[in-house]
Amino acid sequence: MTEFTPYFFDFSHLDYRNFVVLRFHGYSKRKICKMYKLAYFCILRVCEQAQKNDYRFTYKDYVYLKSYDVTNEFICKMYRIDLLDLEFFEVMNR
């Protein structure tokens, strides 16, 4: 696990962006549960919402993830986006 200390402002509510950043930096789902004082099924619900496309990926999300050095490949994996689509998305929003 890399040395990464999250400095998110709100530890009371886990959103998918924070989840992706923490997973990228090597935090397990169980460790995230302890950090946010959540039950494990809450993490699964957040992931399930993203899989059902209830969570829209926006340029604001992209900029946020890049500010935490999340790679494009990892973003594609977590959001189930094709790499070419992500590159097109980045170019169109510049």
PLM region spans:
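General helical structural elements
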Residues: 27, 33-34, 49, 70
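Short alpha-helical "recognition helix" segments of helix-turn-helix
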Residues: 32-33, 75-76
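Short, amphipathic alpha-helical "recognition" segments used to contact nucleic acids or chromatin
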Residues: 9-27, 54-70, 88-90
